[in-house]
Each structure stands twice: as structure tokens, then as C-alpha cells.
Curated annotation (Swiss-Prot):
HAMAP family: Ribosomal_uS2_B (MF_00291_B). PROSITE patterns: RIBOSOMAL_S2_1 (PS00962). InterPro entries: Ribosomal_uS2, Ribosomal_uS2_bac/mit/plastid, Ribosomal_uS2_CS, Ribosomal_uS2_flav_dom_sf. The gene is rpsB. GO terms for cellular component: cytosolic small ribosomal subunit. Belongs to the universal ribosomal protein uS2 family. This is Small ribosomal subunit protein uS2. Keywords: Ribonucleoprotein, Ribosomal protein. One of its GO terms (biological process) is translation. GO terms for molecular function: structural constituent of ribosome.
């Protein structure tokens, strides 16, 4: 049974791609049609590739892989953080700092500084420092937490990277590829899929779409680590038994109705 049903994908708007003038021709095989100047993603393929991504992530997690969630745009930031934490993994949901992976030793020094400032507050050092210095330290900590808080406890570079919108996260993807780290990603119709190891053709701009796909990747990690289905996965299977659009023709009807 598919990990994500056609009905769930439709309700989340996963089928809506970008305007046709913004497309990447390399995504042609994942596009079903065009309606009112918008490309419609072939959800039958999304179902298939989501299954493959789920299996890939689950198997990696079963082998104790470290998985880094990346999504820095506002539509993705909350889901990336929440689902990474739920799965016991790591995330970057604000600006990607160049060299996060390829210059890991420098990033580790910044993380060490973040931990040092936290210790200073906990052990009472802040109480004996001038207020101005404490204010500067708090400002530094806030900035470090914003960009590095999600990888503060990550012991080493990740084994797998999950990305929302690799078009926006091009630097992150390039660093991963340079280090041989496989990339699983939500890929919209405006993106070059060539650098993605496991592609999930999908709308990567709608909050509901991002939440749906990202939650399933977190479910895959939980299942891989626990060796059993998470509660969310079981609920998804039950939901998948409900009446749903079976054919791509029905999808087009829904799209036409939404765009009317």
C-alpha cells in the first residue's frame, strides 16, 4: 500500500506546479498536463516516487544513518524543524551557511562557541559579567542558535540529506554531492532534478504539501529506527482505504475545478 494516498496528495495541493514559463524541461516526464498556465504534476508518479523515498529513508535510518532536513524558505521552516525533531534528527531551517558540510570543522567551532555561551549562563558566569557584555553574548547566542541550533548536537556530517526545494537550496545540494551524501528532495517543476538521488515530484511551495511529504519522511525514520510503523503511518494506511481519485483524469477534473 502506498505511504501517501492520491487523496492526501490532492488535498494538500501537491499536484500544482509552477507557471509553465518557469518550468525546467528536465521535469517534463513528471508533468501530466498544463491548465491555465500552470503545470500539473503527475501524481501517479508522485505516489510511486514517494514510496521509493520512504523506503530509502527508512532503510538508511535502520542502519543508524544521520539524516539532515533542509528547508529554509518560510513555507518549509516550521515543518522541517518539527518533523526533524520528531524523528530525532537534525535540521537547518534558516539561511544555509556556505561550508556547513564542506567546511565542517569551522562549523563545529561555531557550535562549540554556542555551547560555551550556554554553559556560561548555566554556571553563573553571566551574573558576574557587565550587563553590556551579557547583552552581547545573548545576541551572539541568538544568532548562532538561529543558524546552527538544528545541528548543535549533530555528531558528524549527515549520511543522507532531505531537502525541500533544491532549487532554492542549491548550495546545500552542491555540498552534499561533493561529499557523496545522497539527497532526497521534493522537486517542483522549475527545478533541475539531475543532482537529486531520490526525487519526489511535488509542489514545494504550499505549506500543506511540504508538511505532508516531510511528515512522511519523518515517519520513515521512526519506522526504520523502531522497526515498526509509527502511529502516523498506520493512520495514513487507514486513510488510504477511503474513497480517492484513482486516475489522472480525475485529477485533471479537480484541477480544472480549483482553477475555475
Amino acid at each position: 500500500m502506498a505511504v501517501i494516498s492520491m487523496k492526501q496528495l490532492l488535498e494538500a495541493g501537491v499536484h500544482f506546479g509552477h507557471q509553465t514559463r518557469r518550468w525546467n524541461p528536465k521535469m517534463a516526464k513528471y508533468i501530466f498536463t498544463e491548465r491555465n498556465g500552470i503545470h500539473v504534476i503527475d501524481l501517479q508518479q508522485t505516489v510511486k516516487y514517494a514510496d521509493q523515498a520512504y523506503d530509502f529513508i527508512r532503510d538508511a535510518a535502520a542502519n543508524d544513518a544521520i539524516i539532515l532536513f533542509v528547508g529554509t524558505k518560510k513555507q518549509a521552516a516550521e515543518a522541517v524543524k518539527d518533523e526533524a525533531e520528531r524523528a530525532g534528527q537534525y535540521y537547518i531551517n534558516h539561511r544555509w551557511l556556505g561550508g556547513t558540510l564542506t567546511n565542517w570543522s569551522t562549523i563545529q567551532k561555531r557550535v562549540a562557541r554556542l555551547k560555551e555561551i550556554k554553559r556560561m549562563e548555566e554556571d553563573g558566569t553571566f551574573e558576574v559579567l557587565p550587563k553590556k557584555e551579557v547583552a552581547l553574548l545573548n545576541k551572539q547566542r541568538a544568532r548562532l542558535e538561529k543558524f546552527l541550533g538544528g545541528i548543535e548536537e549533530m555528531p558528524r556530517i549527515p549520511d543522507v540529506m532531505y531537502v525541500v526545494d533544491p532549487h532554492k537550496e542549491q548550495i546545500a545540494v552542491k555540498e552534499a554531492k561533493k561529499l557523496g551524501i545522497p539527497v532526497v528532495a521534493m522537486v517542483d517543476t522549475n527545478t533541475d532534478p539531475d543532482d537529486i538521488d531520490v526525487i519526489i515530484p511535488s509542489n514545494d511551495d504550499a505549506i500543506r504539501a511540504v508538511k505532508l511529504i516531510t511528515a512522511k519522511m519523518a515517519d520513515a525514520i521512526i519506522e526504520g529506527r523502531q522497526g515498526e510503523d509509527s502511529v502516523e503511518s498506520v493512520e495514513a494506511e487507514l486513510a488510504a482505504t477511503e474513497t480517492q481519485a484513482d486516475s489522472i483524469e480525475e485529477i485533471v477534473e479537480v484541477v480544472e475545478g480549483d482553477n475555475a
